[in-house]
């Protein structure tokens, strides 16, 4: 049977890392962790699980960090996880079955269910949040995007959906959400600015309103209770902020 590695890029994940690794430690052949400068006891936790621990603080974005981490993988397959994710038993079986079958020219999408502010979000356009996370190590890799990086693979590749959820404990509080979304907004604006793009505040307003309507009404976010409403409002806010950030940068040129 082909071998499989878990690969992760992390920073200051002592709170979540053990819970994540507990769901994979008994059935993967290798755990690869690339740290970008943790100041908590992330490293000690990783090493206690037998992980191969590497460090790179020269941060050039999520995509390039994942590319570097993949270079350390020695197994036939790589499974990408974030520290705030957990592999369910059903998903574990689906992953092992895919690796055993070892189909050519295939990458695998995993359905992710996110818990936000204490509730699983099953609507709002968030579920099933299919993400490509499993593939042959020498077949594909992430692009070099600063943020919201995606796996790139050859034309003609079959994308197969696996069963079993990947649990994602994404936002633990509103403060946690705002801190993470601010980082994403900055990276988005950096990326757009580097391509010579500009934005207007009206674009920010219209995209924010569109975001709320889509999530809460069209994607039935109201079925996710108060958390669904809060998530739609915060997502609209984050959408506005990223356009406002890009707009504000252009003002300094005048």
Curated annotation (Swiss-Prot):
Entry superkingdom: Bacteria
- What GO terms are given for molecular function? glycosyltransferase activity
Keyword check for Glycosyltransferase: yes
The UniProt record lists the EC number as: 2.4.-.-
Write out the entry's keywords from A to Z. Glycosyltransferase, Transferase
- Is Ribosomal protein set as a keyword in this record? no
Similarity annotation: Belongs to the glycosyltransferase 2 family. WaaE/KdtX subfamily.
Q: Which Gene3D superfamilies match?
A: Spore Coat Polysaccharide Biosynthesis Protein SpsA, Chain A (3.90.550.10)
- This one is known as Uncharacterized glycosyltransferase HI_0653
């Amino acid at each position: 049977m082909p071998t499989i590695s878990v690969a992760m890029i992390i920073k200051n994940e002592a709170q979540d890392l053990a819970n994540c690794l507990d769901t994979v430690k008994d059935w993967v052949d290798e755990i690869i962790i690339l740290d970008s400068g943790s100041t908590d006891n992330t490293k000690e936790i990783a090493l206690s699980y037998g992980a191969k621990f590497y460090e790179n603080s020269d941060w050039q974005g999520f995509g390039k960090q994942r590319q570097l981490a993949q270079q350390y993988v020695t197994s036939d397959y790589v499974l990408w996880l974030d520290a705030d994710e957990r592999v369910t038993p059903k998903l574990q079986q689906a992953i092992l079955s895919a690796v055993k079958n070892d189909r050519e020219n295939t990458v695998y999408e995993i359905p992710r269910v996110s818990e936000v502010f204490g509730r699983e979000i099953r609507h709002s356009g968030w579920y099933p949040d299919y993400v490509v996370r499993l593939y042959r190590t020498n077949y594909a890799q992430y692009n070099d995007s600063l943020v919201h990086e995606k796996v790139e693979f050859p034309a003609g590749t079959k994308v197969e959906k696996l069963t079993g959820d990947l649990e994602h404990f994404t936002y633990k509080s509103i403060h946690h959400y705002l801190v993470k979304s601010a980082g994403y907004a900055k990276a988005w604006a950096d990326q757009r600015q580097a391509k010579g793009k500009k934005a207007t505040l009206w674009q920010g307003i219209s995209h924010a309103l569109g975001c709320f309507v889509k999530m809460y009404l069209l994607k039935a976010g109201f079925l996710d209770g108060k958390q669904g409403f809060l998530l739609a409002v915060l997502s609209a806010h984050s959408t506005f902020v990223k356009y406002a950030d890009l707009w504000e940068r252009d003002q300094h040129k005048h």
